[in-house]
Amino acid sequence: MFTLLVLLSQLPTVTLGFPHCARGPKASKHAGEEVFTSKEEANFFIHRRLLYNRFDLELFTPGNLERECNEELCNYEEAREIFVDEDKTIAFWQEYSAKGPTTKSDGNREKIDVMGLLTGLIAAGVFLVIFGLLGYYLCITKCNRLQHPCSSAVYERGRHTPSIIFRRPEEAALSPLPPSVEDAGLPSYEQAVALTRKHSVSPPPPYPGHTKGFRVFKKSMSLPSH
């Protein structure tokens, strides 16, 4: 409730603070003439112009009067930095604050966005370099495969070597195949010594244990009777 009373007490002060809002009947007659403007002024106001300070670095591009105050709105400090002289700054600021920014006769001409153009060209160049490197790598890989076609064939042939060897009859008669280990069985002690050429090898030790109860049976081979 107290807040509402405070707001109601502030209404007269607010109405006195905006005297231009109260228009008389005479001022309402010329309201249409003040609101609408000509076609040329409207087109000039809505027309898009490329500013010099758009998309570039002001550290490398020094500012001047055309850039700071004509192409854009500047303040007194920026104007003083441009003119350096206090008298010239005051004279310019009096005219600038009254008339606003003014453009030259050639100010309406379209400007070229140099930085945007350079950015597009640099991006296109980077893409071309990347695609060129990829194409070079693919060409080198393909050429290496064409120059060495035997390596893969030898590798495949080594993997799939047949285990069955076919020989001609005369070769088999001259050099018969050695018997396999499964057919020949285990070699005897003398054969093992002869194969390894280790004659100094002592015979295996006797079996530890009692041999009195064992008998040696000799099998005699007899020819069958006719």
UniProtKB/Swiss-Prot annotation:
Q: What InterPro entries does the entry give? A: Coagulation_fac-like_Gla_dom, GLA-like_dom_SF, GLA_domain, Peptidase_S1_coag_factors
Where on this chain is LPXY motif (motif)? 186-189
- Regions crossing the membrane: 114-134
Q: What Pfam families does this protein map onto?
A: Gla (PF00594)
Q: What is its main location?
A: endoplasmic reticulum
Alphabetically ordered keywords of this record: Cell membrane, Cleavage on pair of basic residues, Disulfide bond, Gamma-carboxyglutamic acid, Membrane, Phosphoprotein, Signal, Transmembrane, Transmembrane helix
What are the disulphide bonds in this sequence? 69-74
Modified how? Gamma-carboxyglutamate residues are formed by vitamin K dependent carboxylation. These residues are essential for the binding of calcium.
Q: Which residues lie on this side of the membrane: Cytoplasmic?
A: 135-226
**Tissue expression notes:** Widely expressed with highest levels in kidney.
Positions bearing 4-carboxyglutamate: 72
Propeptide-annotated positions?
A: 18-49
- Signal sequence extent: 1-17
Q: List GO terms (cellular component aspect).
A: endoplasmic reticulum-Golgi intermediate compartment membrane; extracellular space; membrane; plasma membrane
Q: Where is this motif: PPXY motif?
A: 204-207
Q: Which of the residues are on side Extracellular?
A: 50-113
Q: Where in the cell is it found?
A: Endoplasmic reticulum-Golgi intermediate compartment membrane; Cell membrane
Q: Phosphoserine (modified residue): where?
A: 163
Spell out the molecular function terms from Gene Ontology.
Answer: calcium ion binding; serine-type endopeptidase activity; WW domain binding
Gla domain span: 52-98
Give the way it sits in the membrane.
Answer: Single-pass type I membrane protein
Full protein name: Transmembrane gamma-carboxyglutamic acid protein 4
The upper taxonomy is: Eukaryota, Metazoa, Chordata, Craniata, Vertebrata
